[in-house]
Structure formats: C-alpha cells, structure tokens
C-alpha cells in the first residue's frame, strides 16, 4: 500500500473527519462564546457592580508609566509598560468555564443516548417467552 493511499484511508476515516468538523465548529463557537461573555455577561456584571466597569482596564502596573500616556490598558501596553492584566484573565476564564460547561452538557447528552442504545440492544438479546418455553421443554425431554 502506497503512502498516499494510506493517507487517504486515514484522512477519510470517520473519526478524523468528525474531529475536523469538530475543530471547525469549535472555532466558530469560540466567537459566539467570546461575544456572550464580553457583550452580555460582563456588562451585566458591571451593572451589578455599580456602574461602568471595563474588565480590560483592570490591571496592576508593574513598571513606571511614561508621562503623557493614558492610564488605560491599550495605551500602557502600546507604550511597552509591563502590566498584570487580571481583568483580561477574568474574561478568558469566564469564556473557558462557559465553553467547558457547554461541552460537558453535550458529552453528557451523548453518553445518555449511548447508554439508552446499549439498553435497547440488551433488551433485544433477551429470548422471547416461546424460546424460553422451548428450552425448558427440551431440558425436560433430555432428562
């Protein structure tokens, strides 16, 4: 078998194609999750916290800020000032938790469906009453 035909067989197997589709959908879903966190959840948290709260501008200055530079994350980062950007980390952490929860729920649903199918298969393998009766008669006759 040539290397090219082996690669085709590998690439066209169901698991590899499923993985490729999953990665593409995951990339698109990442944008949805980011928007959910930044455009919906964080503004609600800011409102509850009592006003306009920009998580991106939550940081600790680790160096001296040059004169004339605004004390915002973007301006300080552009000026090369070292920052501990814990606000951005909070946003990314919330993104991760939401994504992990959604994936958990999807896997949980798939496992439930898989278990249901396994139970149905086991039920199908149970012999009917007629078969059980015939086995019993056969055993009594063989004695």
UniProtKB/Swiss-Prot annotation:
Main location: membrane
Domain of life: Bacteria
Gene Ontology CC annotations of this record: plasma membrane
One GO MF term attached to the UniProt entry: mechanosensitive monoatomic ion channel activity
Signal peptide coordinates: none
Residue stretches spanning the membrane: 16-36, 40-60, 87-107
Subcellular location: Cell inner membrane
InterPro entries, per the entry: Mechanosensitive_channel_CS (IPR019823), MS_channel (IPR001185), MSC/AndL (IPR037673), MscL_channel (IPR036019)
Keywords, ordered alphabetically: Cell inner membrane, Cell membrane, Ion channel, Ion transport, Membrane, Transmembrane, Transmembrane helix, Transport
Its membrane topology: Multi-pass membrane protein
Functional note: Channel that opens in response to stretch forces in the membrane lipid bilayer. May participate in the regulation of osmotic pressure changes within the cell.
Similarity comment: Belongs to the MscL family.
HAMAP family named in the record: MscL
UniProt name for this protein: Large-conductance mechanosensitive channel
Organism the protein comes from: Psychrobacter sp. (strain PRwf-1)
Organism lineage: Bacteria, Pseudomonadati, Pseudomonadota, Gammaproteobacteria, Moraxellales
Gene symbol of the encoding locus: mscL
């Amino acid at each position: 078998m040539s290397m090219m035909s082996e690669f085709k067989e590998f690439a066209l197997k169901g698991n590899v194609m499923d993985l490729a589709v999953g990665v593409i959908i995951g990339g698109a879903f990442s944008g949805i999750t980011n928007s959910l966190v930044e455009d919906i959840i964080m503004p609600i948290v800011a409102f509850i916290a009592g006003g306009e709260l920009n998580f991106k501008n939550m940081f600790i200055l680790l160096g001296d800020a040059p004169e004339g530079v605004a004390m915002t994350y973007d301006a300080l980062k552009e000026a090369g000032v070292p920052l501990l950007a814990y606000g951005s980390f909070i946003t990314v952490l919330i993104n991760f938790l939401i994504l992990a929860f959604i994936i958990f729920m999807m896997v949980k649903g798939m496992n439930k469906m898989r278990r249901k199918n396994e139970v149905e298969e086991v039920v199908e393998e149970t012999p009917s009453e007629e078969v059980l009766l015939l086995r019993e008669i056969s055993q009594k006759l063989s004695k």
